[in-house]
Amino acid sequence: MDLYREEILDHYKNPRHFGPLDGFSQKAADRNSSCGDSLAMGIKVKNGKIADVKFTGVGCAISLASASMLTEMLKGKNLVQAVKIDDAAMLKRLGIPISLTRQKCATLGVAIWQKLRPLLK
């Protein structure tokens, strides 16, 4: 379990695919009203695959780390594979038990991904 915690901290301190969403035509955002976490994500699809994905925002370690992990899970996937990524997949990917109160933090990125999915078809 320590390896998972170390990976979460690494993604929090060094988020992957984090930055401005300039140039992304497909964007969505969401906010966790219970804690104030706020994230936005942009996706580029080319030839049926997620060619690029970025996120930006502010939040706790869990929301930022899980968004970073989610971008890694999405990038390079074809859309058929990518639509299978849901809350359960994200919680499994984190690899540690997440309390009910923190699950919304952990799945905020997935909520944004679900908003983006219809825009990609």
Q: What residues fall within each predicted segment?
A:
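Domain-level signature for proteins that mediate thiol-based redox and metal-cofactor handling
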Residues: 1-121
